[in-house]
Amino acid sequence: MSGEDEQQEQTIAEDLVVTKYKMGGDIANRVLRSLVEASSSGVSVLSLCEKGDAMIMEETGKIFKKEKEMKKGIAFPTSISVNNCVCHFSPLKSDQDYILKEGDLVKIDLGVHVDGFIANVAHTFVVDVAQGTQVTGRKADVIKAAHLCAEAALRLVKPGNQNTQVTEAWNKVAHSFNCTPIEGMLSHQLKQHVIDGEKTIIQNPTDQQKKDHEKAEFEVHEVYAVDVLVSSGEGKAKDAGQRTTIYKRDPSKQYGLKMKTSRAFFSEVERRFDAMPFTLRAFEDEKKARMGVVECAKHELLQPFNVLYEKEGEFVAQFKFTVLLMPNGPMRITSGPFEPDLYKSEMEVQDAELKALLQSSASRKTQKKKKKKASKTAENATSGETLEENEAGD
């Protein structure tokens, strides 16, 4: 294989790439479900984060075993953010842990990659809801709002549509539940080994962000991690001084590190994680990792994923799914075990256009018989997907 061929970007136009995405998605969904089941009152968040990451490594270790050079594993470390914590809470052993309690609103966020093809997922639920009862009040409002935002996006992120259409729909859905999307949060296009591709969808932009944010059109064979974060409050996420534990390398930055600890740490980051987000928990010597990261972050070799908070007493819900824009419609490869009947809100979407959108089918068109004959490869690439779509859309 010549160097030129290697440089050529692989997309979901190739069957094998679709397969890798689906395998990663399948693992992400299984790990997520297992963590949701393990989340009950008295369980430590640290233990769940460790369990999630260990499961991802174990499951990705079972596939493509013959491909010794293939990188696979964690594309986003397991983060469990509770109540008013917005995102990226993934404590180290040396940090203060959080113990789940009944009634906590929990967001689990994680990512898996197979050969650099990324499947991200996030899901929100309430801990220990008694059988036969429903979640009501602001928790129900915010979870319903975020879930419907995700459902709207599944129907809007498709070739020919603009990113601004999604942003507008999110504002309308959230506001109908008297909630607000978290200001300035981005959903990114995904490419091989790249979790933050150039096309993005912005949530609830400020006037300045509206001016700066690039309008983009979705195109066939693109992949997106659609990330919805909705707050019962004002939607402003702030850093409250909680230690950052998740970072990723910025391949565009160069700097000659001065400290030996930093150099050793950074070379391990490059070797083990490339440009994927990672947690300092993954290092054998956590103390050295905490020291080594400082100089790397200061000179922007590493980008931090800061732990953010909404105001105390508010609730933030998150749903994230990964979608492949196939020629015959969007294919969602990740989703959580959402149970709509558990959440009872006094509010609902009023906008007629949005209502119609949410009621429209999100399953993909199955290809006509003639087409199938003409393109056996297309059939192979899309076989069995409508079933998954229906499951994901439940």
Curated annotation (Swiss-Prot):
It comes from Homo sapiens (Human). Changing S361A: Loss of phosphorylation and interaction with ERBB3 and HUWE1. The modification N-acetylserine is found at S2. Isoform 2 interacts with the cytoplasmic domain of non-phosphorylated ERBB3; the interaction requires PKC activity. Interacts with AR. Treatment with HRG leads to dissociation from ERBB3 and increases association with AR. Interacts with NCL/nucleolin. Component of a ribonucleoprotein complex containing at least PA2G4, NCL, TOP1, PABPC2, RPLP0, acetylated histone H1 (HIST1H1A or H1F1), histone H1 2/4, RPL4, RPL8, RPL15, RPL18, RPL18A, RPL21, RPL11, RPL12, RPL28, RPL27, RPLP2 and RPL24. Interacts with HDAC2. Interacts with RB1; the interaction is enhanced upon PA2G4 dephosphorylation. There is a cross-link at K298 (Glycyl lysine isopeptide (Lys-Gly) (interchain with G-Cter in SUMO2)). Residues 46-54 are annotated as: RNA-binding. Phosphorylated on serine and threonine residues. Phosphorylation is enhanced by HRG treatment. Basal phosphorylation is PKC-dependent and HRG-induced phosphorylation is predominantly PKC-independent. Phosphorylation at Ser-361 by PKC/PRKCD regulates its nucleolar localization. SUPFAM superfamilies: Creatinase/aminopeptidase, Winged helix' DNA-binding domain. Residues 361-375 are annotated as: Interaction with RNA. Residues 2-48, 301-394 are annotated as: Necessary for nucleolar localization. GO terms for molecular function: nucleic acid binding; RNA binding; transcription corepressor activity; ubiquitin protein ligase binding. One of its GO terms (biological process) is negative regulation of apoptotic process. GO terms for cellular component: azurophil granule lumen; cytoplasm; extracellular exosome; extracellular region; membrane; nucleolus; nucleus; ribonucleoprotein complex. Belongs to the peptidase M24 family. Residues 358-394 are annotated as: Disordered. The modification Phosphoserine is found at S2, S335, S361. This is Proliferation-associated protein 2G4. Isoform 2 is undetectable whereas isoform 1 is strongly expressed in cancer cells (at protein level). Isoform 1 and isoform 2 are widely expressed, including heart, brain, lung, pancreas, skeletal muscle, kidney, placenta and liver. Residues 365-375 have a biased composition (Basic residues). The modification Phosphothreonine is found at T366, T386. InterPro entries: Creatinase/aminopeptidase-like, PA2G4, PA2G4/ARX1, Pept_M24, Pept_M24A_MAP2_BS, WH-like_DNA-bd_sf, WH_DNA-bd_sf. Keywords: Acetylation, Cytoplasm, Isopeptide bond, Nucleus, Phosphoprotein, Repressor, Ribonucleoprotein, RNA-binding, rRNA processing, Transcription, Transcription regulation, Translation regulation, Ubl conjugation.
